[in-house]
Swiss-Prot record:
Cleaved signal peptide residues: 1-24
Any GO BP: animal organ development
Subcellular localization: Secreted
The protein's name: Somatolactin
Recorded GO CC terms: extracellular space
Lineage, broadest ranks: Eukaryota, Metazoa, Chordata, Craniata, Vertebrata
Location, primary (coarse class): secreted
InterPro entries registered for this protein in UniProt: 4_helix_cytokine-like_core, Somatotropin/Prolactin, Somatotropin_CS
Source organism of this protein record: Oncorhynchus keta (Chum salmon)
Family designation: Belongs to the somatotropin/prolactin family.
């Protein structure tokens, strides 16, 4: 087994750890001191399957949150205005493959790296989103709980992957966040209408990126079984 295969196996184990509680899968991945260790008893295939299940769940929750926010706070005429108002997804500028042809051509390593970049880029914006949603008079508890849940899962996921990469690559210069420029646009206190559009854009962009995470992981899964017959739909 080469280094890439070893890295992928351990990445899948660490990626799995934060989501096990939410998925109800009985698995112990920690030692008595609380350190994350490789779940050697679980096959690579099963680990990846559970990671994909977790990614699907995150995407579904993001979709539900976006729909709920839209129904509660966004008048129909405003739903097509967020792009016209100059709001774009912060991750659009990141080196993440976007087109189907680009995604098909990148390596397994870069698929995983892209997932990590997306996770890290959303940690701070989702913390901001929790804060601003708390100021909405009629924000339903369901929306607040969904946002908090996703935020916590992303943070756990990021911490596990960073620890893994530092250990595997012996890279002391690795920081816990690659991208922070996505946070800056949300530091100001906008007016009510602007705030609604901005938060709506955040939720919509996160839903799109959550779908990318799911897509990348499913492509990775496909490549493990039939590398030459994996196509994006």
């Amino acid at each position: 087994m080469n280094m890439m295969q070893v890295m992928q196996s351990v990445v899948w184990a660490v990626l799995l750890w934060p989501c096990l509680v939410s998925l109800g899968v009985p698995l112990e991945c920690k030692d008595e001191q609380g350190s994350i260790i490789l779940c050697a008893s679980i096959s690579k295939e099963k680990l990846l399957d559970r990671v994909i299940q977790h990614a699907e769940l995150i995407y579904r929750v993001s979709e539900e949150s976006c729909t709920l926010f839209e129904e509660m706070f966004v008048p129909f005429p405003m739903r097509s205005q967020r792009n016209q108002a100059g709001y774009t997804c912060a991750t659009k500028a990141f080196p993440i493959p976007g087109s189907k042809s680009e995604i098909q051509q990148i390596s397994d390593k870069w698929l995983l790296h892209s997932v990590l970049i997306l996770v890290q880029s959303w940690i701070e914006p989702l913390v901001y989103l929790q804060t601003t949603l708390d100021r909405y008079d009629d924000a339903p508890d369901t929306l607040l709980k969904k946002t908090k849940w996703v935020s916590e899962k992303l943070l756990s996921l990021e911490q596990g992957v960073v620890v893994l990469i530092r250990k595997m690559l012996d890279d002391d210069m690795l920081t816990t966040s690659y991208y922070e420029q996505g946070v800056a646009p949300y530091a100001l206190q906008p007016e009510v209408l602007e705030s609604v559009l901005r938060d709506y854009t955040l939720l919509s962009c996160f839903k799109k990126d959550a779908h990318k995470m799911e897509t990348f992981l499913k492509l990775l899964k496909c490549r493990q079984t039939d590398k030459y017959s994996c196509f994006l739909h």
